[in-house]
């Protein structure tokens, strides 16, 4: 079947398939990376005129309603119509009779044989047009492409350069501050639209000479340029993890580091995963089942800003397209919601912060320990409370872009593990946890205060066993212990799950890129030259060589063999993790497992533990973000070769910018990274990484997880994770239509992975929003859901992102604040003060007598 571009299709088309994959019935792509082709469609044809009347056509493939202009002559009971006079939108099918019958219209100047031929030609046109079998993708992505839209323009490169430098610099600057500010790439996506349109006013002058010349305004700013620049900014707007390690090394380990080391460690850790992402495209980017749900929000925002795409979703009523009674355009809907989101966020974000931490029961009983531990937000489990802060709702992911079955698995796991099991173990005093806060990501000593790792180290940061015995073992809060256990289970579960559910397709795609079936969006991308595999292989080899040079030439305590172990961690996890995230929006963090392995293979070497964590975790995380953007580029039909160079350029430029900004701050901000820094530049991320490196690298996991040690039982969760997918797979085979058949082991284990520091309040609000929109509305008002759901997600994110930046830069950072009950009530509770269930008296300790 031939893929078609928009120039050859005078209509916009939506199809509803009888055997499409539905998010309410089957977890998208859980069993197969391939897709199935829709067999029957239901269509409506309408003319753009405001004065129209209706006719209908039904047949074994299509049910078609025809709107025609009243000023055109026609005869009823004819056999066909002229397809060039009409555009297409969706309508529910009302007839499935065999054969073809048209109950309306023939133009007076056509013969029966001519219109008969036109019907056959139109049917061939319709059969040639495909769309995704996934309703989420159909609602967000056009199944067409305009190959004539330019991407490799001066606007793309100049705006990419400016936005990458600005976003990388600003986010790096404020990342060293507490509270921090992070400007999301969605802000760039919004600013780029009016700025690009403004550039359309430039004269079309010729700049340069010969082959090095270009025209200043040869074509209007288009959606593909917009998408390419946004993708570049998204890769670099968040702070590189390696810069936090640099903070730990310079400010806490007191190392003098060269510019060369700083640039190399940032770029190698950021780019090592890019090459592997390119080499694995056939598994985690190309398949239709790899939806990458979060990209759909960006896709809809692009479509909404650049035209009226999607406004034809619905049914024709009173000469207007109605989506379950709503006729407002996507653009106006986006504008209204974004403005409302911007205005409302000022309340939970500044005026009445209690709306963000809406733990009313804790406000009523501020000194009741049990109430605060069960229903609190800061150190409690967050049972029942709601939040009116959209940032809290989307803390885990955007619920409007998360499949309902994923939300069910995740929230069910939170309820079972953190709302039932954790309180039982906590109040029984397992591991003396009731002397610690119910929820915290910190480690503690036997007096209930944060563990002071410097008390068990020598001056060279090596472990001193005598000091350790005279001080205290490490104790983890119960929530932290269970989060660690779930992480262990998730790491092994994804391998078993991937083998059972996707193993056959992964093996087939090893030999044939396209697999059993191919998505229409992948087919349309064949209009462009692909970035070849050897480009990505070369990139991986070059960066791998630079990584070896970095750990060998500089003092990192990390031998090459240990580096290779770290790289193997990310390599073997990449495809299973990519499949999981591409389908579910969830991923398994490898930070704990890399620290665990690093602590066992290189005990007593905290700097080496940093390197193992950096190169075992970050290349996979960055590589999967690269893969996500490759999928977004596929949806937006951006030429792969141009995108390849744009992404590399942006990453290198952003990395150097972040290093330069951090270096400037080290020399120009007095007292940086100290707790007494007057402007809050205390380097909280660097301090956290430093403490983690001492705990996992210097003290080591052997003191916690080896046989005979307190947390040894958690190791068995590796086995539990490996076995659990067999159970869920068996249930799916036995009960394919029941909810029990939709249980997904990796999601059950990794879904609650943000606890701590997230709490139940983040998950309960997330689940409620997901239930309303991705279950109730999707089931009862499918046209509304398809037309507005992802627009709503983009508008809410956009309004909050812009409001957050304005509040921080214009009000909070200069020192503005409002002191009243609504901004202080939540801070006067035991929850906010992290009070444990059991308290110690002066000079009292708890815990084991021998460790």
Curated annotation (Swiss-Prot):
Composition skew (Low complexity), residue ranges: 33-68
Chain positions carrying an annotated carbohydrate: 32, 77, 109, 256, 452, 464, 691, 843
Taxonomy, superkingdom: Eukaryota
GO cellular component: endoplasmic reticulum membrane; plasma membrane; plasma membrane of cell tip
Membrane-spanning residues: 156-176, 179-199, 259-279, 282-302, 333-353, 405-425, 480-500, 531-551, 560-580, 592-612, 642-662, 711-731, 757-777, 791-811
Residue ranges that the Swiss-Prot or TrEMBL entry lists as coiled coil: 105-134
Region of interest (Disordered), ranges: 1-116
Key words of the record: Cell membrane, Coiled coil, Endoplasmic reticulum, Glycoprotein, Membrane, Peptide transport, Phosphoprotein, Protein transport, Transmembrane, Transmembrane helix, Transport
Modified residues (Phosphoserine): 93
GO BP annotation list: glutathione import across plasma membrane; glutathione transmembrane transport; protein transport
Induction context: Expression is increased by cadmium ans repressed by cysteine.
InterPro entries given in the database record: Oligpept_transpt, OPT
Membrane topology, as annotated: Multi-pass membrane protein
Entry's localization field: Endoplasmic reticulum membrane; Cell membrane
Residue stretches of biased makeup (Polar residues): 1-14, 74-92
Single GO MF descriptor: oligopeptide transmembrane transporter activity
Biological role: High-affinity glutathione transporter which plays a role in scavenging glutathione from the extracellular environment for the maintenance of sulfur homeostasis.
PANTHER family in the record: ISP4 LIKE PROTEIN (PTHR22601)
Family: Belongs to the oligopeptide OPT transporter family.
Protein name: Glutathione transporter 1
């Amino acid at each position: 079947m031939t893929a078609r571009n928009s120039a050859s299709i005078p209509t916009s088309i939506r199809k509803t398939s009888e055997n499409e994959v539905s998010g309410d019935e089957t977890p998208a792509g859980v069993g197969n990376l391939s897709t199935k082709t829709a067999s029957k469609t239901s269509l409506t044809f309408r003319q753009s005129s405001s004065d129209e009347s209706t006719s209908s056509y039904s047949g074994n493939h299509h049910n078609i309603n025809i709107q025609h202009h009243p000023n055109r002559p026609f005869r009823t009971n004819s056999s066909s119509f002229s397809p060039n006079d009409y555009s297409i939108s969706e309508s529910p099918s009302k007839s499935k009779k065999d054969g073809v019958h048209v109950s309306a219209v023939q133009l007076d100047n056509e013969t029966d044989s001519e219109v008969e031929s036109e019907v056959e030609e139109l049917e061939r046109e319709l059969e040639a047009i495909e769309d995704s079998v996934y309703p989420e993708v159909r609602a967000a992505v056009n199944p067409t492409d305009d190959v004539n839209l330019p991407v490799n323009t001066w606007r793309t490169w100049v705006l990419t350069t400016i936005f990458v430098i600005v976003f990388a610099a600003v986010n790096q600057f404020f990342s060293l501050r507490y509270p921090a500010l992070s400007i999301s790439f969605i802000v760039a996506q919004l600013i780029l639209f009016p700025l690009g349109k403004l550039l359309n006013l430039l004269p079309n002058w010729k700049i340069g000479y010969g082959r090095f010349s270009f025209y200043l305004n040869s074509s209007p700013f288009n959606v593909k340029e917009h998408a390419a620049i946004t993708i570049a900014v998204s890769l670099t707007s968040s702070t590189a993890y390696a810069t936090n390690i640099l903070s730990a090394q310079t400010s806490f380990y007191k190392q003098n580091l060269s510019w060369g080391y700083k640039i190399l460690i940032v770029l190698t850790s950021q780019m090592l995963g890019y090459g592997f992402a390119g080499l694995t495209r056939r598994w985690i980017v190309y398949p239709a089942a790899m939806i990458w749900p979060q990209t759909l929000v960006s896709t809809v925002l692009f479509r909404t800003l650049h035209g009226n795409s999607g406004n034809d979703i619905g049914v024709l009523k009173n000469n207007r397209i109605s989506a379950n009674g709503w006729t407002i355009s996507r653009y106006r809907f986006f504008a209204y919601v974004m403005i409302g989101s911007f205005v409302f966020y000022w309340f939970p974000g500044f005026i009445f912060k209690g709306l963000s931490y809406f733990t009313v029961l804790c406000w009523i009983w501020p000194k009741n320990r049990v109430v605060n531990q069960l229903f609190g937000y800061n150190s409690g489990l967050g049972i029942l409370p709601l939040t009116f802060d959209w940032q809290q709702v989307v803390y885990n992911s955007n619920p409007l872009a998360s499949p309902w079955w994923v939300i069910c698995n995740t929230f069910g796991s939170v309820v079972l593990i953190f709302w039932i099991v954790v309180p039982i173990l906590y109040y029984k005093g397992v591991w003396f946890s009731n002397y610690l806060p119910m929820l915290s990501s910190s480690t503690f000593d036997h007096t209930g205060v944060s563990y002071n790792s410097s008390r068990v180290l020598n001056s060279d940061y090596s472990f001193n066993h005598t000091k350790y015995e005279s001080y205290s073992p490490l104790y983890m809060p119960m929530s932290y212990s269970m989060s660690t256990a779930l992480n262990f289970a998730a790491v092994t579960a994804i391998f078993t799950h991937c083998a059972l559910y996707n193993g056959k397709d992964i093996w087939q795609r090893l030999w044939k890129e396209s697999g059993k079936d191919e998505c229409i969006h992948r087919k349309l991308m064949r209009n462009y030259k692909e970035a070849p595999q050897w480009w990505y292989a070369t990139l991986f080899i070059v960066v791998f060589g630079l990584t070896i040079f970095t750990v060998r030439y500089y003092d990192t305590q990390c031998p090459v063999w240990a580096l290779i172990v770290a790289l193997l961690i990310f390599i073997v996890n990449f495809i299973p993790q990519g499949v999981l995230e591409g389908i579910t929006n969830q991923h398994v963090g490898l930070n704990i497992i890399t620290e665990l392995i690093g602590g066992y293979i290189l005990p007593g070497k905290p700097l080496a533990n940093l390197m193992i964590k950096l190169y075992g975790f970050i290349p996979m995380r960055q590589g999967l973000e690269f893969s996500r953007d490759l999928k977004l580029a596929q949806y937006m039909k951006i030429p792969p070769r141009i995108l390849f160079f744009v992404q590399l350029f942006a990453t290198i430029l952003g990395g150097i910018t972040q290093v330069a900004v951090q270096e400037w701050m080290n020399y120009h901000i007095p007292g940086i990274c100290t707790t007494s820094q007057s402007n809050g530049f205390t380097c909280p991320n660097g301090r956290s990484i430093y403490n983690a490196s001492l705990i996992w690298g210097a003290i080591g996991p052997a003191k916690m997880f080896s046989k005979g040690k307190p947390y040894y039982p958690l190791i068995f969760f590796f086995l539990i994770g490996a076995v659990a997918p067999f159970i869920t797979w068996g249930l799916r085979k036995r009960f394919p239509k029941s909810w029990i058949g939709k249980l997904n082991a990796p999601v059950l284990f990794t879904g609650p992975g943000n606890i701590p520091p997230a709490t139940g309040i983040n998950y309960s609000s997330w689940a409620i929003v997901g239930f309303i929109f991705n279950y109730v509305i999707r089931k009862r008002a499918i046209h509304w859901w398809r037309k507005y759901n992802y627009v709503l997600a983009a508008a809410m994110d956009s309004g909050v992102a812009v409001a957050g930046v304005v509040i921080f830069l214009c009000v909070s950072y200069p020192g503005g604040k409002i002191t009243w009950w609504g901004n202080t009530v939540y801070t006067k509770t035991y929850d906010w003060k992290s009070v444990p269930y059991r308290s110690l008296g002066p000079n009292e300790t708890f815990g084991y007598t021998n460790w």
